[in-house]
């Protein structure tokens, strides 16, 4: 990590929502490694989570707070006492086909967090975890965009489709998820512009996340699909190709940059390493685990993902801030996943 002035100094406490989640646990781990303290939100007691981080980083550096409702003002107010930065990774009420639940709920939660944080002078940075699906990379049929995606492009199609009666039922959960991120991200940036709080807000937009799972109790949708392939289960994602992948630890690095780097302000960070196909994934898994005869064949894929222009800037941030060569490769990402999951 680069030395110099950071928005949140080492030793400060960062709040990470959904700390027992796949991405949030990776972010928590990196923050602890860099000398920060973490207060993680969970929906119920997770003694294994406290034990995992305390065993590796000592007592007093990680704690959990139970928040069952992200719109609970009183609980949030208490949770933000002494907090210098927030990584809002959890997605409240995400997986529903009803947009009244799946879209409006998470948006209200984000605005609630911003409003409460504005009353705490200690908060200097907030980072929202979004998705590359908040940009217009693919349509409802999985076809890639025909024009390059830039940092001011939004997936307005998803917002429209979320409320349309003609949207196929099997697509609604994913569409609603993208729509919630579009609406939440856009309204958060507008809220900051309108209210001029004492903190900045940045947004990290991960692609299909692949990499190490820290603990057996941690799961993530993307890694469930990879583990399923190792067990001989064809993934439903064969029918829907995510346009880009990203290593989980690179996602964590970009969250840290968004929290700490003064020059990164009110930015959407496109966390996308490279396009991929399921044929590539299957081929690499077979190389990594040659004795595994269960891994199914992947279908032919002739689609060419869209060009995500801002991904280059995200990679440069990792190079400059962490001194790395760039994004982690798909092979290395899968290797770490197989090592921990096989």
Swiss-Prot record:
Family annotation (PANTHER family): ALDEHYDE REDUCTASE II (AFU_ORTHOLOGUE AFUA_1G11360), NAD DEPENDENT EPIMERASE/DEHYDRATASE
Gene transcribed to yield this protein: nvfG
Official protein name in the record: Ketoreductase nvfG
Phenotype on disruption: Completely abolishes the production of novofumigatonin, but accumulates asnovolin A.
The EC number(s) this enzyme carries: 1.-.-.-
Family assignment from sequence similarity: Belongs to the NAD(P)-dependent epimerase/dehydratase family. Dihydroflavonol-4-reductase subfamily.
Pathway: Secondary metabolite biosynthesis; terpenoid biosynthesis
One Pfam family recorded for the sequence: Epimerase
Transmembrane segments: none
Biological role stated in the UniProt entry: Ketoreductase; part of the gene cluster that mediates the biosynthesis of novofumigatonin, a heavily oxygenated meroterpenoid containing a unique orthoester moiety. The first step of the pathway is the synthesis of 3,5-dimethylorsellinic acid (DMOA) by the polyketide synthase nvfA via condensation of one acetyl-CoA starter unit with 3 malonyl-CoA units and 2 methylations. DMOA is then converted to farnesyl-DMOA by the farnesyltransferase nvfB.
Gene Ontology biological-process entries: novofumigatonin biosynthetic process
Alphabetical list of Gene3D superfamilies matching this protein: NAD(P)-binding Rossmann-like Domain
UniProt keyword list: Oxidoreductase
Oxidoreductase is among the record's keywords: yes
Source domain of life: Eukaryota
Organism of origin: Aspergillus novofumigatus (strain IBT 16806)
GO terms assigned for molecular function: ketoreductase activity; oxidoreductase activity, acting on the CH-OH group of donors, NAD or NADP as acceptor
């Amino acid at each position: 990590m680069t030395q110099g002035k950071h928005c949140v100094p080492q030793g400060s406490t960062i709040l990470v929502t959904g700390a027992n989640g796949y991405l949030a646990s990776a972010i928590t781990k990196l923050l602890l490694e860099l000398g920060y303290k973490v207060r993680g939100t969970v929906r119920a007691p997770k003694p294994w989570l406290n034990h995992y981080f305390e065993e590796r980083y000592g007592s007093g550096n990680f704690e959990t707070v139970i928040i069952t409702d992200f719109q609970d003002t009183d609980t949030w107010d208490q949770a933000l006492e002494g907090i210098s930065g927030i990584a809002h990774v959890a997605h409240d009420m995400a997986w529903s086909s009803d947009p009244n639940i799946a879209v409006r709920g998470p948006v209200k939660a984000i605005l609630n967090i911003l409003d409460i944080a504005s009353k705490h002078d200690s908060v200097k940075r907030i980072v929202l975890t979004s998705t590359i699906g908040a940009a217009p990379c693919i349509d409802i049929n999985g076809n890639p965009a025909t024009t390059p995606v830039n940092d001011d492009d939004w997936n307005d199609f998803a917002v429209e489709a979320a409320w349309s009666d003609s949207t196929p039922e099997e697509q609604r959960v994913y569409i609603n998820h993208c729509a919630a991120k579009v609406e939440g991200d856009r309204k958060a940036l507008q809220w900051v512009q309108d209210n001029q709080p004492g903190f900045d807000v940045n947004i990290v937009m991960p692609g299909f996340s692949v990499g190490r799972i820290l603990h057996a109790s941690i799961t993530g949708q993307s890694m469930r699909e990879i583990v399923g392939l190792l067990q001989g289960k064809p993934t439903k994602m064969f029918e829907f190709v995510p346009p880009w992948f990203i290593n989980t630890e690179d996602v964590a690095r970009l969250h840290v940059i968004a929290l700490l780097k003064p020059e990164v302000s009110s930015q959407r960070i496109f966390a996308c390493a490279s396009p991929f196909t399921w044929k590539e994934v299957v081929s690499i898994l077979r190389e990594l685990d040659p004795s595994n005869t269960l891994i199914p064949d992947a279908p032919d894929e002739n689609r060419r993902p869209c060009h995500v222009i801002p991904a280059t800037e995200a990679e440069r941030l990792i190079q400059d801030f962490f001194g790395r060569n760039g994004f982690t490769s798909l092979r290395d990402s899968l290797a770490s996943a197989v090592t921990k999951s096989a």
